Amino acid sequence: MSETLNLQIPSPTFEGSTGGWLRAAETEEKYAITWTSPKEQVFEMPTGGAAIMRKGENLLYLARKEQCLALGTQVKTSFKITDYKIYRIFPSGEVQYLHPKDGVFPEKVNPGRIGVGNVSHSIGKNLNPAQIKFTNKSFCD
């Protein structure tokens, strides 16, 4: 799938209601998530209820970016689908590609990305707090 949004992609089959979420999104902005499924399967909607994703490409509109991220995490962990993309759609029709911004998901490392807050050892190599409690040494050193 490319970074441009094809609005002709079919949506998953959903028999419920979004509870009015998308009504407000029509006047402000809405979000779209796309993914490719190897087969038809039932998934849980972030707004509640369940839907059936279609075999092939799927397009789903949601009102909040957090709902798209939650659904993206679900399809990645439960269904092993890793090609999802999230877009912001403004009322004017302008489409902005949001996630993953540089083509790599945030939890992965690519050559151009700088790690922030990384520790160069495993958690098993951490100091025992009881051994350094009354010394001048810090946990972070």
UniProtKB/Swiss-Prot annotation:
Q: Where in the cell is it found?
A: Plastid, Chloroplast thylakoid membrane
Under InterPro entries, the record lists: PsaD, PsaD_sf
Chloroplast as a keyword of this entry, yes or no, is yes
Residues spanning the signal sequence: none
Any one GO BP annotation for this protein: photosynthesis
Show the GO cellular component annotation of the record. chloroplast thylakoid membrane; photosystem I reaction center
Tell me which domain of life the UniProt entry assigns to the organism this sequence originates from.
Answer: Eukaryota
What are the UniProt keywords, alphabetically? Answer: Chloroplast, Membrane, Photosynthesis, Photosystem I, Plastid, Thylakoid
Give a yes or no for keyword Plastid in this entry.
Answer: yes
Q: How does it sit in the membrane?
A: Peripheral membrane protein
User: Which Gene3D superfamilies does the UniProt record give?
Assistant: Photosystem I PsaD, reaction center subunit II (3.30.1470.10)
According to its UniProt entry, what is the function of this protein? PsaD can form complexes with ferredoxin and ferredoxin-oxidoreductase in photosystem I (PS I) reaction center.
Similarity section? Belongs to the PsaD family.
The protein depicted here goes by the name Photosystem I reaction center subunit II
This protein's gene is called: psaD
